[in-house]
């Protein structure tokens, strides 16, 4: 049985312990100590990382009553070793875990719902609630949670007796057996938890909701706390400042400026499309009457352009129209046929041109890795009129 020193003092970073066991498993070693400061993964909180006797601790998990440390090198059984946890990693987890407790407590207290899922990832935290949270309520909930930080509310930990526990209102995701560990944050939350936490809510710094979505009939929230929240704000602030600089407006007006740019872009695209359609119509009118098969080469045409132009050529009386546009490598194309034999052309182009694509008997599209000269010869041999 490993003594859990992290429950004595979540702020301690160094300790000494005796190696009870060390076994090689899949190119790593699993080490069991008589006592440890390393918190094992559990309850939604990732494991601590750090070093033991000069070797790296890569992961930590529970196995029965033992705490198992995964290391990159072996440690001698019976030796006394010095251990040190990565404090920056630990404190980040403490900030985010305590922040999650406060926000969950505020939400569950307001809506009478349950927190049915919790995951603390490398980038952010997600919490799953079994009720739908209105989007317009999120600013209030976020501010209420941060109120605990502003008041610097103490984060207390206690181990109530069965009698005390029976009278206590607390959150828990599952039925608990044995001694229950309760984490209490003033009026904001009371929850059964095995994780490490800050002593004062002020140490969390900030709780920020960065996303919300409907999930399994309830709501999934994404949040950041502490240093993560600061880094996210800094990143977004830098982005908005840069957008403002590029558009020559203050950062706070960047969204309006972007909307104006998008509106101008849409107008330009509309004008461009109108010019394209006029161009396609003009080129189609230049096709000699009685032309049954026609091949056209263009540049900068998208799938919609290719199809539209090929359709215009069919409307002019052609039976088959192949329209190609220069791409990064080779050409993209659309081939339409009133004779229902379009697939035959893509099949024939597979071997010589590496044709990739498909479609229906009367319409195919795809890509070829070929030069214009080779494509011209291929279609000329099939009695296509070449147009550019």
Question: Where are the model-predicted features located?
Answer:
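A glycine- and charged-residue-rich anion-binding loop/surface
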Residues: 1-388
């Amino acid at each position: 049985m490993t003594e859990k020193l992290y429950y004595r003092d979540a702020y301690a970073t160094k300790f000494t312990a005796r190696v009870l066991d060390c076994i090689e498993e899949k190119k790593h070693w699993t080490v069991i100590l008589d006592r440890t400061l390393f918190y094992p993964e559990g309850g939604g909180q990732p494991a601590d990382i750090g070093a033991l006797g000069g070797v790296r601790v890569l992961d930590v998990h529970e196995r029965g009553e033992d705490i198992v440390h995964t290391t990159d090198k072996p440690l001698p059984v019976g030796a006394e070793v010095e251990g040190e946890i990565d404090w920056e990693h630990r404190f980040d987890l403490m900030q985010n875990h305590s922040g999650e407790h406060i926000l969950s407590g505020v939400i569950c207290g307001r809506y009478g719902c349950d927190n049915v899922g919790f995951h603390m990832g490398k980038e952010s935290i997600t919490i799953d609630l079994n009720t739908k949270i209105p989007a317009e309520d999120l600013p209030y909930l976020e501010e209420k949670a941060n109120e605990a930080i502003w008041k610097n509310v103490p984060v207390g930990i206690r181990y109530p007796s069965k009698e005390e526990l029976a009278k206590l209102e607390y959150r828990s995701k599952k039925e608990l057996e044995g001694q229950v560990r309760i984490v209490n944050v003033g009026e904001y939350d009371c929850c059964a938890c095995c994780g490490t936490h800050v002593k004062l809510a002020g140490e969390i710094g900030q709780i920020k909701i960065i996303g919300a979505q409907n999930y399994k009939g309830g709501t999934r929230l994404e949040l950041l706390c502490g240093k993560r929240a600061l880094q996210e704000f800094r990143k977004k602030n830098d982005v908005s400042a840069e957008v403002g600089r590029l558009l020559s407006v203050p950062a706070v007006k960047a969204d309006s400026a972007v909307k104006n740019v998008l509106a101008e872009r849409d107008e330009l695209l509309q004008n461009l499309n109108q010019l394209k359609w006029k161009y396609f119509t003009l080129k189609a009118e230049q096709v000699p009457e009685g032309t049954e098969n026609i091949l056209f080469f263009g540049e900068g045409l998208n799938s919609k352009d290719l199809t539209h132009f090929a359709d215009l050529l069919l409307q002019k009386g052609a039976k088959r129209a192949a329209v190609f546009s220069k791409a990064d490598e080779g050409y993209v194309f659309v081939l339409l046929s009133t004779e229902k034999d379009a697939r035959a052309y893509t099949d024939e182009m597979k071997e010589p041109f590496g044709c990739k694509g498909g479609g229906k008997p009367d319409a195919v599209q795809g890509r070829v890795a070929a030069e214009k000269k080779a494509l011209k010869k291929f279609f000329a041999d099939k009695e296509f009129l070449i147009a550019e």
